Amino acid sequence: MPRETAPREVTLLADARARARRARDWATADDLKAQIEAAGWNVVDTGTLYDLHRAVPPDVEVDGVLHYGGAASVPSRLGDPPVGTVSVVLVATDDAAAIARSHAAVIANAPSVSQVVIVANAPAEDVATVIADIEASAPETPPTEVVRTARRLGHGEALNAGLRRCAAPVVLLLDPSVEVRGDLAAACAAALADPSVAVAGPVGLVSEDLRTFEPADDAAGECDVDVIDGAAFAFRREDVEARGPLDDHFVIPAHLDTWWSLVLRDPWAIEEPVEGAPVRRAVRLASVPAVRHAGLESPVRGNQEKLEKKAFYRVLKRFATRQDLLVANRP
């Protein structure tokens, strides 16, 4: 859902705290942070700037089943040793047929998958029924785990909730609109076995200016691209800890794939970057059988065009000048 705007009194506290931090008055900054948190908000620093987030709502137990108030409440497996080969994450919201079809296709056609995580993102009633049926009938191998939320999360946060439960070394984010008809997971894992590759998937996009992105030429076969389309998007689980989490300002799917592709490829996106490290690659896979039945489903209502613009500005805020990340500008 669209991010809630903090009350003016909380924003004033945050502004005062930012000034204190710039002045290195840490005691005052800590006191102001405590006041912000007491008002029910969290402040997240980004350099000399900040973001305000409503504190995560409480988890809710319904009929003995825990529904998480936010992604941060979901117990994380990201620090555990990897298990299996590929974890698939599906986010279910309002399309019952899509989640049933996509999950069934993964189980039937992708033997490389070792775990499926379904995020039941405060779904519609018929979707909740389908998910319950999946839980009851899903095979033990690969296991299917359902993460339920107490409220409708934005797209980025919903994916974060699923990512926190992933156990395998490779993660495949799969939109329910996609029906795999072959072992897409195996193809993604094979591509990511190359340490120079950061992200892989069946649809790739390229750009000459970081403002407009176009599908890569189909005739090119498997090739390097700038961005992998978010409908089917694979990367290493270890990068979630090193470079994540996903930015939950992306409340709809639009442009989150662009942002995360560039974060994964950017040699400066880690805590201790190595001088001279190369830009990592995004690889568009060729001849991977999958059918996309519709566009990505938005988890939120509201003015989609306005939300898309805000999401794109989020990309530009970080990467507008990073021409070095574009395949077209390789030496």
Task: Name each model-derived stretch.
Residues 171:
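Short aromatic/hydrophobic "clamp" motif used to bind/position activated sugar donors
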Residues 182-213:
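Conserved donor NDP-sugar-binding/catalytic core segment of glycosyltransferases
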Residues 68-81, 198-199, 208, 233-234, ...:
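C-terminal, non-catalytic tails of nucleotide-sugar-dependent glycosyltransferases
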Residues 104-113:
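Short, acidic, metal-binding catalytic loop of nucleotide-sugar glycosyltransferases
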Residues 120-130:
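A conserved acidic beta->alpha catalytic loop
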Residues 230, 241-265, 282-283:
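Donor nucleotide-sugar recognition loop
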Residues 149-166:
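Glycine-rich, basic loop-to-helix element that forms the pyrophosphate-binding segment
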Residues 216-235, 251-253, 300:
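A recurrent flexible, glycine/aromatic-enriched loop bordering the glycosyltransferase active site
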